A protein has these predicted regions:
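Short, flexible loop/hinge motifs at secondary-structure junctions
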Residues: 1-74, 148, 282-287
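Catalytic center-proximal scaffold of phosphoryl-transfer enzymes
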Residues: 45, 53-418
Length: 418
């Protein structure tokens, strides 16, 4: 949405006699005007000399707004700008379709149904979905380092609510976020909607030759260590820290030393970012004597406490220690490459808007709704990574697709919005 500047000048003739203007400046006052334009186009049904029948709009020469007719999203009666507004509100501002139709749009004197909004969102998702293969190809290119996480969702099926999972993959270097919801086949050959099994991730990765995959310590990822031998698996130090923080907050003072040592490691990572170090320099710093001493201190504290009877510590402290011990190699594998991340926060941050949407909408009406959500959130979060407006990108994309363009690799947020 652009800011329209309207200049209001003072009428100097209204000054009292004898008054003198000492200086002049403009005071900015901001106002928002929300309204919907309803354009009525005269569409002609024409029979040509060769017998062809065609519907067409023939604009008048002085009709400055006639080009809006060419901005209609295929299969709808709204423009790309309108659809970008609706999808922005729903997926980025987490406004449910019901509240959009019954509150926001009705306040602007447009009475439309919730089903219309869902149908239009479906049409937009069909257009965006054409670009997913091109986006996936870049995200999973040879040697890529990716972060992966998942979150649960509910959807309506057969008069009851079912639980399923949406996955998120982030390639920080390529600045790409992809949400995916895949149908899989279980060990008995039965097809399942979504799910949290390793088959979902395996099928999405396919034969991609990525370099590393970072996740939390969920067993699905650990099984992949045996099946994807060429991919280095990293775990999340932030997860370990969270477990010690929880134990400390519940009274386990033994966790304090772990929190302090982990904080020092994070402090070093902040320094690398501030100094804008190269991956090679980060690799050297991560394997410096100072860093090694901190990690060895962590190891010593870990095994000293594990050597004591379990009764000497709380249950939460035991869970934190066991997590750190179990995933030690994967947690500190971030030292193997300067491009690796110390934690899995890139994927977790990308998932947060989905969790907000889940709280506001409670459940999806169908599997199709989940798939559309994955598509829209993919491009919303990728636009954030690239630093462009999703609304601007979506409008530009739909206009280019209407021209018949199929070079999808040149229509991605990082290419079309250069």
């Amino acid at each position: 949405m652009q800011v329209h500047r309207i200049i209001h000048k003072s009428d100097y003739t209204m000054l009292h006699e004898g008054s003198v203007v000492i200086s002049s400046s403009y005071r900015k006052i901001r106002n928002i005007v929300s309204h919907i334009e309803e354009h009525h186009f005269e569409v002609l049904k024409v029979k040509h000399a060769d017998g062809r029948i065609e519907s067409m709009f023939l604009p008048m020469k002085d009709d400055a707004r006639a080009d809006i007719y060419n901005e209609i999203v295929p299969g709808t009666s709204i423009t790309a700008n309108m659809l970008s507004y609706l999808t922005f509100n729903r997926f980025q501002m987490s406004t449910s379709a019901y509240r959009e139709a019954k509150n926001r749009l009705s306040d602007m004197d447009w009475n439309t149904s919730v089903q219309n909004l869902l149908n239009w969102a479906d049409k937009g998702a069909m257009q965006l979905n054409k670009l997913i293969p091109a986006l996936k190809k870049i995200a999973l290119q040879d040697g890529a380092n990716v972060n992966v996480d998942e979150t649960w969702l509910r959807y309506h099926a057969y008069n009851k609510k079912r639980k399923t999972y949406m996955w998120c993959l982030v390639n920080r270097k390529a600045r790409i976020v992809i949400f995916f919801y895949e149908d899989t086949t279980d060990d008995e050959g039965l097809q399942k909607h979504g799910g949290r099994s390793r088959n979902v991730l395996k099928e999405f990765l396919g034969d991609a030759k990525i370099k590393s995959l970072q996740s939390d310590g969920y067993n699905v990822y650990m099984y992949l260590d045996n099946e994807l031998m060429d991919i280095e698996h990293l775990c999340c130090l932030a997860h370990a820290r969270a477990k010690f923080k929880y134990a400390y907050d519940q009274g386990s003072l033994q966790a304090r030393i772990f929190l302090e040592l982990i904080a020092r490691l994070y402090g070093m990572e902040d320094t690398y970012r501030r100094e804008k170090l190269t991956p090679d320099e980060i690799y050297r710093r991560r394997n410096s004597k100072e860093t090694t001493e901190i990690i060895e201190k962590l190891r010593t504290e870990l095994y000293d406490l594990l050597a004591n009877p379990e009764e000497s510590r709380s249950e939460l402290m035991s869970k934190a220690l066991n997590y750190l011990k179990t995933f030690w190699n994967q947690i500190f594998a971030y030292r193997n490459d300067g491009e690796y991340s110390i934690d899995n926060l890139p994927a977790e941050r990308a998932l947060r808007p989905v969790t907000v949407q889940r709280k506001n909408s409670l459940f999806f009406g169908s599997v199709k709704g989940i798939q559309n959500s994955a598509i829209y959130n993919t491009f919303i979060e990728t636009c954030k990574q690239v630093g462009v407006s999703f609304r601007d990108y979506f409008c530009k994309l739909l206009k280019e697709l209407k021209k018949g363009r199929t070079d999808y690799e040149n229509l991605l947020p990082m290419t079309i919005c250069k």
